Regions:
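Cell wall/extracellular polymer interaction/catalysis modules
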Residues: 1-104, 110-115
Length: 115
């Protein structure tokens, strides 16, 4: 993940599964993001206007098993229970939240092009 064109964070998402809710990564595109208080995860970033999806968040977690279609951020890659993971996720999320305090836009530019 880049902030102001500079590499800042590593991410983990589920693979492309045809934008199926709760299991697929989100499609390429430009999305509005904003700080959001989640009952489950606390202060996170909400990703708005994802086609046919809702409640997409950028939150802390380590592996794709920790997400249901959301984006996880971390400081470095590692392994958890033999799965690829991002590490220092809470630290990375807090750092990201300190950079993004107002609504802004995020572009997903790598991954599956849904058409």
């Amino acid at each position: 993940m880049r902030v102001d064109e500079e590499p800042e964070f590593l991410t983990v998402e589920n693979p492309w599964l045809y934008n199926e809710r709760n299991v697929s990564c989100i499609p390429k595109g430009v999305y509005n993001i904003r700080p959001h208080k989640s009952p489950r995860y606390g202060l996170v970033l909400a990703v708005d206007d994802v086609p046919n999806r809702s409640h997409i968040l950028i939150h802390a977690g380590n592996t794709a098993a920790d997400t249901k279609g959301c984006i996880l951020v971390g400081e470095r890659f590692g392994n958890v229970k033999d799965m690829r993971a991002v590490m220092q996720s809470r630290f990375a999320l807090n750092r990201l939240l300190s950079m993004i305090t107002e609504p802004c836009q995020m572009e997903i530019s790598y991954g599956y092009d849904h058409g």
